[in-house]
Amino acid sequence: MPCPRPFWLRHSRAPQGSGPSSPGSLSAPRSPSRGEDQEEEEEEEGDGSPGSGPILPPASPVECLICVSSFDGVFKLPKRLDCGHVFCLECLARLSLATAGGGNAVACPVCRAPTRLAPRRGLPALPTQSGLLPRDARAPPSRQGSVRFDRRRGLLYLRPPPPPPGPRKARAPPPPPPLRLGRPLSRRLSLASPAWVFNAAVALAVLVAAGLVVSGVYIFFLIPHATSSGPPRPQLVALAPAPGFSWFPPRPPPGSPWAPAWTPRPTGPDLDTALPGTAEDALEPEAGPEDPAEAERTLDRRSDGTWGTEAGPGWAPWPRGARRLWGSQ
């Protein structure tokens, strides 16, 4: 069904040949081909599109210009905007949900003029044209209740009036169910909008504050509690050296002869006194050689006293199978 055009946008066209012709038209006759072209152009301008159907009659003043529905006293209340156009409350609510923003204003769908809304009351606070309502819907607002619009949930609902004082004579009819209109148009954050900078700053501040709180709880509460309630741990004690202790040998007094820090190995007869128990540890020869040939080889060595002298002081030949002995021979 094509949408009807408002009556103020339509311009009537006088039928040809119905009225008296001007004198100029009698003196200048038109050619038949030119007259047909002008008639086709006028038809296209009047209809808005070539080949369209017949012009619909103007909308009734008791119908909404958007949904072409009759006004009533519930959700089809006639609401007047600041520009003077009248629409039903349901259509204005759907228009508000389809418009990005906080719902603080609504634009007229005909002239695009904005209308400011009350901060907390919204669309139901617009003036109502009671003269466009049918007679059965012209009840006082105190009896029929108030219509509310929840833009966040997209609901139109009727709030029932308070019960009248006095005895209850008859039950009031139940209110109509709420009308769901859909969700409002969500704002998509993009890099071009300045809102994302504020949101990012708030998120960063929240993260930093949460990190500081967690760190403070861990440092000032968890660590002291763990150290106080846990088993005693061994502590390291620094052992200081005794007073007067020195890591270096004492220096000799001046004028004393120099003595080396090491002592030479004792040689000669002092060895037995310097190393006690050496004679006990020395192994005696097990037994003499039983083979006479082997004994001769052993005796071939120099048996005079100069052999040990040439070899060095304190050196003596040692028999086979015995340990070396230090001392004078």
Curated annotation (Swiss-Prot):
Pfam families per UniProt: zf-RING_UBOX
Compositionally biased spans, kind Acidic residues: 37-47, 281-293
Membrane-topology descriptor: Single-pass membrane protein
Compositional bias per record (Low complexity), positions renumbered to this chain: 14-32
Segments for region (Disordered): 1-55, 122-181, 248-329
Comp. bias intervals (Pro residues): 159-179
Residues that span the membrane, as ranges: 203-223
GO terms of molecular function: ubiquitin protein ligase activity; zinc ion binding
Database matches in CDD domains: RING-HC_RNF183-like
Record protein name field: RING finger protein 225
Organism encoding this protein: Homo sapiens (Human)
